[in-house]
């Protein structure tokens, strides 16, 4: 997605060897116009897939997931990283390791929001090692629902997340694919769209 790649080049900041900071438009402050375009692109791509729910993980996946769900006219569910007292029955959980935060969290979704009839599109902000998507897949499958595809805003193609998911049989669509960081600049790999 050319618009997204341009924004990454303009406002993204490389930290170390493998971190891209995009807090000015995705991971802290949200550019709703860009997120709306991202949502439209995902919705157009998956319009024929019969999607009934969009699922993401808090927090930075919420914005692109909301706009995707809006464009598809289906509910969006986000997995919570912390249990609260209102989530006390029928909770579906999985362990998820965060590459950026270097911690493992138990993420959860109330089972009442997913059913075996659901066809789910997972949307997330980044794909690195695939652990967030893998955890969401586990939760979705605990409910008996089907993962139709995984939509990623920014993929770190130099990490093994995509291979892990595709080898497990899940289609992955990434709007921006980072090939590498070179001389303080992002070098893109050809995106899926």
Swiss-Prot record:
Enzyme Commission number(s) of this protein: 2.4.2.22
Binding site for xanthine: 20, 27, 156
Residues bound to 5-phospho-alpha-D-ribose 1-diphosphate: 128-132
Keyword Metal-binding: no
Entry keyword set: Cytoplasm, Glycosyltransferase, Purine salvage, Transferase
Cellular component, GO annotation: cytoplasm
Subunit annotation: Homodimer.
Catalytic activity: XMP + diphosphate = xanthine + 5-phospho-alpha-D-ribose 1-diphosphate
Pathway note: Purine metabolism; XMP biosynthesis via salvage pathway; XMP from xanthine: step 1/1
Entry GO MF terms: xanthine phosphoribosyltransferase activity
Keyword Transferase attached: yes
Pfam families per record: Pribosyltran (PF00156)
Taxonomic source organism: Streptococcus pneumoniae (strain CGSP14)
Family: Belongs to the purine/pyrimidine phosphoribosyltransferase family. Xpt subfamily.
Compartment(s): Cytoplasm
UniProt-recorded name of the protein: Xanthine phosphoribosyltransferase
Gene Ontology BP, a term: xanthine metabolic process
Role noted for this protein: Converts the preformed base xanthine, a product of nucleic acid breakdown, to xanthosine 5'-monophosphate (XMP), so it can be reused for RNA or DNA synthesis.
Top EC group: transferase
Signal peptide: none
